[in-house]
From Swiss-Prot:
Involved in cell shape control. The keyword GTP-binding applies. Disruption phenotype: Does not affect motility. No differences in growth rate or cell size. One of its GO terms (cellular component) is cell division site. Pfam families: CetZ_C, Tubulin. This is Tubulin-like protein CetZ3. It comes from Haloferax volcanii (strain ATCC 29605 / DSM 3757 / JCM 8879 / NBRC 14742 / NCIMB 2012 / VKM B-1768 / DS2).
Length: 389
């Protein structure tokens, strides 16, 4: 699937960095172009893969290149005011080569959470290609204002895109990691999952041909349910001489390849992917649509295993709209990616909304209390001191 990536804000830019880095290392060619949009000049300078010619600094007259300070209403305003600059850069893209746009943003900050829905709305108004969102939820300990930002952005973003893929930082952060290392590893994990999913079917024709091809139409149909999506992933290393692009499929445990266990291996991987750590933890029963992609050497991609895994996922989700296919690549790993679209039983989102409501109430009460306290401070009580004007 050919994508145009648009990273909004600091987190969005760094995730796009990770996706482009993955695509370049694996030479899979699913990224047609990538653009970074931010209100903070320093954040744009920190990007590795987006050259200055593919960067847009917005809000220069309002915030002078210093960012919006986690104010997502201001973030939405500065993006809306300068959206013409963003669209002008997008106009330069070879849109005829693009299957979809992917707008990426952290939902807890200011520029990304406020601006991503604005960009998505404009893209849907102008282009016929699907516009998908990738939203990153803040961790619980990042603070109430970021939770409130995320809750407000979430309900707006999901309305403006054709489908919103969600990644929950809180479910993936490891204890003891530094902030920079933690987010770096999370971005790499997310890029691996999305990379395997979107690069399926994008080979140059020189390798093995998939028996059941997963192309752009399969992904578009799966995401066609709208709403919210989550992605699962599992990988296992084959016990044989290493070869090929090992970095593409990593993180699995070593396992012997006896030639007759391919079916069981694939069904086990798909179960682990669907029932393990999803990008957004949720109850998978009730998902509207699903897609299974199994990647690895062609000689271990059992068609029977993929069909059994697909049938199992139909039973678990309760929907017959489960697509599946293989993705032959030269690797020493076998990996399964499960995309679940239209999920709705998501406790984390309900928790996020509850905390956001409480934060909003506290902020309003504090604002009213502060105004009254200031009046008490400046008042002399008997009104004998006159103000200057």
């Amino acid at each position: 699937m050919k994508l145009a990536l648009i990273g909004i804000g600091q987190a969005g830019g760094k995730v796009v960095d990770a996706l482009v880095d993955y695509e370049r290392r694996t030479k899979t060619g699913f990224v047609v172009d990538a653009i970074a949009v931010n209100s903070a000049r320093a954040d744009l300078r920190g990007l590795r893969t987006a050259p200055e010619s593919r960067q847009v600094l917005v809000g220069l007259t309002r915030v002078k290149g210093h960012g919006v300070g986690a104010d997502n209403e201001l973030g939405a305003e500065v993006i809306a005011e300068d959206v013409g600059e963003v669209l002008s850069m997008i106009d330069d893209l070879p849109v005829h080569e693009i299957d979809a746009f992917l707008v990426v943003a952290g939902l807890g900050g200011g520029t990304g959470s406020g601006g991503a829905p604005v960009i998505a709305r404009e893209l849907k108004h102008i282009y016929t290609e699907p516009v998908y969102g990738l939203g990153i939820l803040p961790a619980r300990d990042e603070g109430g204002i970021y939770t409130l930002n995320a809750a407000r952005s979430f309900q707006t973003f999901v309305r403006e895109v054709d489908n919103l893929i969600v990644f929950d930082n809180d479910a993936w952060r490891k204890t003891g990691e530094s902030l920079e290392a933690g987010y770096g590893s999370l971005n790499a994990e997310l890029a691996r999952r999305l990379g395997v999913l979107f690069s399926a079917g994008e080979g140059d024709g020189s390798g093995a041909v998939a028996e059941s091809v997963v192309d752009a139409s399969e992904i578009i149909n799966t995401l066609g349910s709208g709403g919210v999506s989550t992605i699962g992933y599992a990988a296992v290393e084959l016990d044989r001489p290493k070869r090929g692009l090992l970095s593409r499929l990593s993180g699995g445990k070593a396992e012997a390849d006896d030639g007759g266990d391919s079916t069981n291996r694939i069904t086990s991987l798909v179960r682990r992917a669907a029932l393990g750590r999803l990008t957004l933890p949720c109850e998978i029963s009730g998902a509207e649509r699903g897609l299974v992609v199994v990647a690895g050497p062609s000689d271990v991609l059992s068609r029977r295993g993929i069909e059994r895994a697909r049938t199992w996922l139909e039973d678990e989700t309760g929907t017959m709209e489960i697509r599946g296919g293989d993705y032959p690549i030269d690797s020493n790993f076998v990996a399964a990616v499960v995309l679940l679209s239209g999920v709705y039983d998501v406790p984390r989102v309900k928790e996020l909304q509850a905390v956001a409501i409480e934060t909003q109430r506290d902020m309003l009460a504090k604002r009213e209390s502060s105004a009254a306290s200031l009046d008490d401070l400046v008042s002399t009580g008997d009104d004998r001191i006159e103000p200057l004007f």
